[in-house]
Amino acid sequence: MIFQEVPLNVVLTIYSEDIDEDYIYGKIVMRNEEEVIIAQINDKGESDGYLYLQWEGIYRIDYESSYEEKIERLYQAKNQYHEELMFPKKEDTLLKNLLNWAFCEKKIVSIYFADSDMEVEGYLKNAQGSQIAQVDVYEAVF
């Protein structure tokens, strides 16, 4: 199966070498030839933000099994939703669009650096995502 042909807005189990977990649940909301944005759902069926991945790191996608159906039922039963991604201006990559959206909407981002196992959480200081005002678990900026 070609991953880019997986249906949009259907609960999936995604396996990628670019995430710390063994797998994640979510719905693909945007994609192009190289990138994908996933509306992530935790194992309790709750909205868990957006996740950006590149297709090259994804090695398996499951959908329409009893696991994904259970997550979908929980998601609906808990009246969960993901805020619609409205990109103010179209950039050349989904990553740039997502960072620009997070900056404009003042969303907290978590950025993982796979090559160093480092993670940074905070608010973007600019739309390019090159500067982040880090926050702690209480959302205090430091």
Where are these regions (language model features)?
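Residues located in well-ordered beta-strands
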Residues: 27, 37, 54-57, 123
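N-terminal beta-strand/beta-hairpin edge segment
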Residues: 27-29, 34, 39-44
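Short glycine-rich, low-complexity segments
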Residues: 1-23, 41-119, 138-142
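Short, conserved beta-turn/loop elements at beta-strand boundaries and strand-helix junctions
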Residues: 31-36, 63-67, 127-132
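Short, intrinsically disordered, charge-balanced linker/junction segments flanking boundaries
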Residues: 125, 130, 134-142
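Short beta-strand-centered aromatic/proline hotspots
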Residues: 22-30, 120-127
